[in-house]
Amino acid sequence: MKILVDENMPYARELFSRLGEVKAVPGRPIPVAELDDADALMVRSVTKVNEALLGGKSIKFVGTATAGTDHVDEAWLKQAGVGFSAAPGCNAIAVVEYVFSALLMLAERDGFALSDRTVGIVGVGNVGARLQARLEALGIRTLLCDPPRADRGDEGDFRSLDELVQEADILTFHTPLYKEGPYKTLHLADEALIGRLKPGTILINACRGPVVDNTALLARLNAGQSLSVVLDVWEGEPDLNVALLEKIDIGTSHIAGYTLEGKARGTTQVFEAYSTFIGRAQKVALDTLLPAPEFGRITLHGPLDQPTLKRLAHLVYDVRRDDAPLRKVAGIPGEFDKLRKNYLERREWSSLYVMCDDASAATLLHKLGFNAVHHPAH
């Protein structure tokens, strides 16, 4: 059995070799000749999976180690009788911590308390729901917009996008990309919406590039109206609008979900799905794969305030480390993908062991995802 895996999927070789012969290949473009005698294909979001790629091939199963699936023609796979699995939620924690890293940086730079701000979350799935929980643990007011969930009658106080634009100081997008239909998200932030944003609004897009109209956003920024903008995703990736990058506060190369834990979850989820598909079901414990974190333990004295949270969060991940490299190479062909391929190891907050002498700090840090324990001072 021959299994093709994207060369940038961590732990793919060691896991899938338990099931058959593994060949690691580039994801963009996939070397088509390798598909002729392969049984399964494991990809990431850079690979377009459709009839053009797989028609007439022997592939019986496709796995994508990503939460999003807009790069996969699921209808064609189903019609062709090809098994399929994605990895929903695999990198949700990573994206939430990316958003926090950016917000804590902007709050320090501009001198505001996050607790004084209202955050509008557009798309309340795996990422949006976790972001809401962590913000609310800090006492930060959130407004939720998720029309599909509202229409299904899901529990929650769902508002219209218009209400979020009017009331929120921070607007962050966490939707899938739907190009048409009743829940279309293509250019959800269109020229009209971007024009209605209050001066000083923070706009964050860490889901899919085309959810925000990049041309309209640049036009508003060029008009000199104050917005703070954080973009991890771009229209036309791997190309991006360099003029837009120059105008925004934080710009990164579609890496918000790129923690070691998130990538490992993506790989293990599709590995488990494929092992079940071929009747050899296996489970993998994530911590058996991950290396020891960079920091052993941190001791925290006293309660948790915003500057302390920022220091802890940025000890694990400071978003600025990914902003600078993109600005250096923006517009040079091939460099966007190279930044993603050669991405520096990044961990999640759970990798940081924090000993707190203040019980409330330990409880709060634990709610926020840190590995925190209360250890009273003697």
Curated annotation (Swiss-Prot):
Keyword Metal-binding: no
Enzyme class name: oxidoreductase
GO biological process entries: 'de novo' pyridoxal 5'-phosphate biosynthetic process; pyridoxine biosynthetic process
Sites where the protein binds substrate: 45, 66, 258
EC number: 1.1.1.290
Alphabetized SUPFAM superfamilies for the sequence: Formate/glycerate dehydrogenase catalytic domain-like, NAD(P)-binding Rossmann-fold domains
Reactions it catalyzes: 4-phospho-D-erythronate + NAD(+) = (R)-3-hydroxy-2-oxo-4-phosphooxybutanoate + NADH + H(+)
Predominant place of localization: cytoplasm
Gene3D superfamilies noted in UniProt: 3.30.1370.170, NAD(P)-binding Rossmann-like Domain (3.40.50.720)
Active-site residues per Swiss-Prot or TrEMBL entry: 208, 237, 254
GO MF terms, alphabetically ordered: 4-phosphoerythronate dehydrogenase activity; NAD binding; protein dimerization activity
Protein's cellular compartments: Cytoplasm
Residues the record lists as binding NAD(+): 146, 175, 232, 257
Pathway field: Cofactor biosynthesis; pyridoxine 5'-phosphate biosynthesis; pyridoxine 5'-phosphate from D-erythrose 4-phosphate: step 2/5
Cited function: Catalyzes the oxidation of erythronate-4-phosphate to 3-hydroxy-2-oxo-4-phosphonooxybutanoate.
Family that this chain belongs to: Belongs to the D-isomer specific 2-hydroxyacid dehydrogenase family. PdxB subfamily.
Quaternary context: Homodimer.
UniProt protein name: Erythronate-4-phosphate dehydrogenase
Species assigned in the record: Citrobacter koseri (strain ATCC BAA-895 / CDC 4225-83 / SGSC4696)
